Design a protein with these regions (language model features):
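Sequence/structural signature of small/polar-enriched beta-strand/turn repeats
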Residues: 2-4, 88, 112-114, 141-147
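Exposed extracellular interaction/assembly regions and N-terminal maturation sites
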Residues: 8-15, 21-124, 157-184
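Structured beta-strand segments within beta-sheet-rich domains
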Residues: 121-148
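Extracellular disulfide-bonded cysteine-rich modules/repeats
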Residues: 146-156
Length: 184
């Protein structure tokens, strides 16, 4: 071991190091650890196409639309407290869609849609009856710009309209903005 550090001082306070901490310092000193980025266990990257599904095990994760092409992501059956945060990291050139698992599931709540190219913004709500089961961002007037974010939270354990609560801010392109919510 190049350095036998046994104690460190942080903001004037001294701390004794145990064997594990000393070994970690030695490993870093010897260049044995390569740090390439943060922990990505809380992130799920979507691929182009309609084969993307999030599961109950993905609850709490950040779900990333990271390809411009059309991408569909289907939600699981709802459970109270289940939460998914969808982020768009690239301007959509095809539809970026979030779909409820069945037509019987649906969204409540709403999002804002802000144009990045014109002084235009508006707020849109899902149908109050919970019938909307799609959120579609095209990269145009209804969101899909890089930086768009949608959070979906399960508010019912039953397969019923209005079992998902939605909030978010979508970035659009153009002089008009339109709703991203639809029934199909």
């Amino acid at each position: 071991m190049a350095n036998s550090i046994k104690q460190v001082t942080v903001k004037g306070s001294k701390f004794n190091l145990g064997s594990i901490e000393s070994a970690a310092i030695a490993g870093v000193e010897q260049g044995e650890n390569i740090f390439t980025g943060g922990n990505n266990h809380g992130v799920k990257l979507l691929v182009a196409g309609a084969a993307n599904t999030v599961t109950a095990a993905d609850s709490g994760k950040i779900i990333v639309f990271n390809v411009a092409a059309a991408t569909l992501c289907t939600l699981p059956a709802p459970k109270i407290g289940m939460k998914f945060t969808f982020i768009t990291s690239i301007l959509a050139t095809g539809d970026h869609e979030i779909q409820a698992a069945t037509n019987g599931h649906g969204f409540l709540g709403g999002v804002t849609v802000d144009s990045t190219t014109a002084a235009k913004a508006d707020a849109f709500s899902a149908n109050a009856n919970g019938a909307d089961d799609f959120i579609t961002q095209t990269g145009g007037t209804n969101g899909g710009g890089a930086g768009s974010i949608v959070t979906v939270v399960g508010i019912s354990d039953t397969s019923a309209a209005g079992c998902w609560l939605v909030s978010g801010n979508l970035l659009a392109v153009g002089s008009t903005t339109v709703t991203p919510f639809a029934t199909s």
